[in-house]
Amino acid sequence: MKQFILSCVLSVAAIAPSQAQQTTRQLPVYLDQTKPVEQRIDDAISRMTLAEKIRIIHAQSKFSSAGIPRLGFPDFWTDDGPHGVRPDVLWDEWEQAGQTNDSCVAFPALTCLAASWNPQMSRIYGEALGEEALYRGKDMILGPGVNIYRTPLNGRNFEYMGEDPFLASIMVVPYIQGLQSKGVSACVKHYCLNNDEEYRHQVNVIVSDRALHEIYLPAFKAAVEKGKTWGIMGAYNLYKNEHNCHNQWTLNKILKGDWKYDGVVVSDWGGAHDLEQSVKNGLDMEFGTWTDGLTMGATNAYDNYYLSMPYMKAIQAGKFTQKELDDKVRRVLRLFYRTTMNPNRPHGFLCSESHYAAARQIAEEGIVLLQNRNNVLPINTQKVKRVLVVGENAIKMMTVGGGSSSLKVQREISPLDGLKTRLGKDGIEVDYARGYVGDVTGNYNGVTTGQNLEDKRSEAKLIAEAVEKAKTADYVIMFGGLNKSDFQDCEGHDRKHYELPYHQDKLIEALAKANRNFVYVNISGNAVAMPWKAKVAGIVQGWFIGSESGEALASILTGDANPSGKLPFTWVNSLKETGAHALNTYPGTWRQKGGASTKGNIIDEEYKEDIYVGYRWTDKERIKPTFAFGHGLSYTQFSISNLRSDKMQMKQDGTITFTVNVKNTGKRAGAETVQLYIHDVEASVDRPQKELKGFQKVHLQPGESKDISITISKEALSFYDEASSSWKAEAGKFEALVGNAADNLKLKKAFELF
């Protein structure tokens, strides 16, 4: 009997592989995971009808596009980032869907991530965000943003990675890799030249090819060539009089031609304006168009999108062939195979403790200690008995607002609560005074903070209360700055002024006079004017840092964590210290009278400062800013010494490695960022005095030292040559400048390229 059973088992075992092989052979190629993806795409395209091709290249709801049910391709779902997964909205409109499971962890804004100067933080950020997106059923996160910080008035700077193209290029790549390692597509935005918000739909940017390639494109190029991003979002603005969501130069020539990009180009919501340009100039997926019938309460208006029925009818009428359509479909199917049709996507997690820990770690590494006179920080918790906290930003929830990056969170710890919890452990009394009243609404697009911030007291009474309490406190910590309301750090508008709103300057001066241990914490994604800087003991740049805001800030202020952030932009004294404002090119010149109220009017904005953005401009004009690019202090001290190189002459196809010794000479563990800049001593064209071309963050215990090496190739020495439309590295003399900030480069090493 046992022998009979064994024979049966062996017979079945022998048959099973044959049946499995037969089943595999019977699978259509587009479903056969053993086949190359491009072959599967070819097979899928051959099976699709014209209508099926059209249906996958435009939206079917606010944030989704249709799949191909007949062939087993599911719908594709996007959602806003880049700091967390946006709460779900209604199918056709922007109102909240009213779900109870669409909260998220709010991660620090990307200015804070960039300020960490730590690519490892970018990887952690991307992975955690990808896991949250997976749990929420999202296939693409609309981010990260890498538009360059050209003016501190840009309302959306907080979503970007600063002024320097090299820093942004290094920081964006691990974010993309981390996110896409979870099977969720990045959608790097806003490509390109979307450097201010106020007239973003009407701005036609006039910029030299050199500035375009040296300043505004490198981070996008890195996202494509090194990050291998699967998605790129076009920008609202125009370049060479064509909107960037369907622009023959930026999309067809540069992105898909020069960079060989194989992913999809997604329109920004409402960024498509023309059928023929949408077909021929590189747009692959159209989302959010509010023209052609999509108005409040309308349904099924997606058929009116340019890449929907108008496109299909034009093909049927012979106006277009299916050549362009098949390229769009190929790219979308490639995206499907990377995401929705990827059987190896992991499981997602939502609001896990590991994600909160990641958010806190990123925040702590990105917070910047700007000024620390007389070592006023960290707070000595063994000697202090009473701390006064001042300012609306100490209690205001900052995850709500700011535009499309607004989030709904399960938890957000305010700075006041964070300090109460931390200082309470040492028996320290924490008092609070409002100081000023700003935006008390606490809601955005149907998501509310649940806070009641109404306060009818006069400015004089608010300041008087704060000053009176400050006189008897051991420390005064004010949380001020901006918020995410219109005309501050918010999408759709730019700031009206460089100065702090709500008369905060007056409050700061009064508090600094009342208490010598006064620390100002600036909560913003932008620089602000600081006319009172010399009167203030401590200044901290606190950013918008999300769910763990209070915990992270309390850790930095008390010394539980040692600040190591560095500024990702130059903190100027006034707007006139930036090229865009010094040359009066912002926000541009209207072509017709009537400005934005004139239908079809365009505003031309010429980037006359050319390549001289940020520290490149202040160097050129010999301006000493409030705080330099790359500036950031620590509670310990470091020495950077013994700069040497592995050679004195570098070949065109070679590399050169620079090495320095970094030592923690203080009494606390901490981290320092070694920054390498290159100076072209003799060039045939005008070049900046220096440009960042390498950096490395190193964590050291007290007394510990390490050698840090940075290797560069001729790419770091090149400029964009407009005559040949190519990058050029000229033979000659160069200098490597090394230090810990753009204004603190004490080491120099000469070398030659031949």
Which stretches of residues belong to each language-model region?
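Acidic/proline-rich low-complexity IDRs
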Residues: 2-5, 9, 506, 582, ...
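Short beta-strand elements
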Residues: 744-754
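Bacterial Sec-dependent N-terminal signal peptides
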Residues: 1-26
